[in-house]
């Protein structure tokens, strides 16, 4: 039995040796295939490939590994000081990583410039207002002084608090009169006419001081919004003005309409050049004036009595008086000239 086991084992040994020889042959064939190096020329860079003794780019090389992998050189990185050709410049500019940020930055700058010119540019004087503002745009600012019962001066603050006015250090409204010179817009309330204060040698009209005091208390140091219509012959801007007052800060009030209701002004009467901001506003103004008349408010107290005159009648009367004075002065100058001429003629 021992001989049979040995003999059977001796018979299987040649087969095992044959299998081992086959396996060794296969391994040798694999090694020969792996040792073959494939060289591919780069058509763009015209550089030969580099070979690394590494089985895979994802695995580090080892001492027992003799497999060679083929890699290809990449384009060298350019520095900031590297000179570029025209072709390189075109390629760099068309790169989306450069083109898209450039377009976004340029568009953003142009948009900011347009917004600043249209909405955030401060207007110092009434004469600097573009005609495109009339009947289309508005002016926002703080009232710095009240000159009469129907006009005041405003410091333009475009954008208001959202643009930094009143809380940023470099966006403060000046308080000193000297600093406000040639930096405020002279506004005349549209559609109303208040009693005249004494000026240009004319006496004060009744209720002129009351109207001036009322408007000063109502507007001075307040933020207002004016809708300009045109410029008058005195360089002022004729505009409808709105203001928000505590506690009704969410409701804006028409300043001219409030003066008519208080009896501190009349509806503006003139043959031409009257601005109301629309027919609907004119009818509203006339209804407010009629209500103040019936209730006898302000300058309408005793208006049916003798000697009462409206601001328009006062202006017409003073214009007539000044015309008579001018005619008398011209006549006196003419008589004096004739007398001197006669004296000189007698001497000759």
UniProtKB/Swiss-Prot annotation:
Residue span, TNase-like domain: 137-302
Record SUPFAM superfamilies: Staphylococcal nuclease
Residue spans of biased composition, Low complexity class: 15-27
Transmembrane spans: 99-115
Principal subcellular localization: mitochondrion
Binding positions (Ca(2+)): 193
Subcellular location field: Mitochondrion; Membrane
Region feature (Disordered): 1-37
EC identifiers of the protein: 3.1.-.-
Pfam entry (one): SNase
Coiled-coil features, chain-numbered ranges: none
SMART domains: SNc (SM00318)
UniProt GO MF annotations: endonuclease activity; metal ion binding
The entry's keywords: Calcium, Endonuclease, Hydrolase, Membrane, Metal-binding, Mitochondrion, Nuclease, Transmembrane, Transmembrane helix
EC supergroup of this enzyme: hydrolase
InterPro entries tied to this protein: SNase_OB-fold_sf, Staphylococal_nuclease_OB-fold
Record's GO cellular component terms: membrane; mitochondrion
Gene3D superfamilies: 2.40.50.90
Active site per UniProt: 188, 196, 236
Entry membrane topology: Single-pass membrane protein
Protein family according to the UniProt entry: Belongs to the LCL3 family.
Protein name: Probable endonuclease LCL3
Species the sequence originates in: Paracoccidioides brasiliensis (strain Pb18)
Gene name of the record: LCL3
């Amino acid at each position: 039995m021992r001989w049979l086991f040995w003999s059977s084992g001796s018979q299987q040994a040649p087969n095992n040796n044959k299998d081992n020889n086959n396996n060794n042959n296969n391994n040798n064939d694999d090694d020969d295939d792996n040792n073959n190096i494939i060289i591919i020329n780069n058509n763009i860079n015209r550089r030969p490939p580099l070979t690394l003794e590494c089985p895979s780019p994802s695995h580090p090389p080892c001492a027992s590994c003799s497999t060679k992998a083929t890699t290809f050189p990449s384009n060298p990185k350019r520095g900031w000081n590297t000179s570029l050709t025209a072709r390189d410049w075109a390629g760099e500019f068309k790169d989306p990583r450069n083109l898209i940020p450039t377009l976004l930055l340029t568009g953003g700058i142009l948009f900011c410039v347009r917004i600043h010119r249209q909405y955030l540019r401060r207007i110092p004087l009434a004469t600097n207002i573009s005609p495109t503002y009339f009947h289309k745009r508005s002016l926002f600012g703080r009232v710095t002084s009240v000159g009469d019962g129907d006009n005041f001066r405003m410091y333009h603050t475009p954008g208001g608090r959202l643009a930094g006015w009143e809380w940023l250090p470099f966006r403060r409204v000046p308080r000193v009169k000297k600093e406000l010179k040639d930096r405020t817009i002279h506004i005349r309330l549209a559609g109303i006419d208040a009693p005249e204060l004494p000026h240009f040698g004319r006496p004060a009209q009744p209720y002129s001081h009351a109207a001036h005091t009322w408007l000063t208390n109502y507007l001075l140091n307040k933020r207002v919004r004016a809708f300009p219509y045109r410029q008058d012959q005195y360089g002022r801007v004729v505009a409808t003005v709105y203001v928000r007052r505590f506690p009704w800060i969410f409701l804006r009030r028409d300043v001219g309409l409030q003066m008519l209701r208080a009896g501190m002004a009349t509806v503006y009467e003139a043959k031409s050049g009257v601005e109301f901001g629309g027919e609907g506003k004119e009818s509203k103004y006339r209804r407010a004036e009629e209500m103040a008349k019936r209730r006898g408010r302000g300058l309408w107290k005793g208006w049916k009595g003798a000697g009462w005159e409206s601001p328009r009648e006062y202006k017409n009367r003073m214009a007539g008086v000044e015309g008579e004075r001018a005619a008398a002065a011209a006549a006196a100058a003419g008589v004096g000239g004739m007398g001197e001429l006669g004296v000189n003629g007698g001497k000759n």
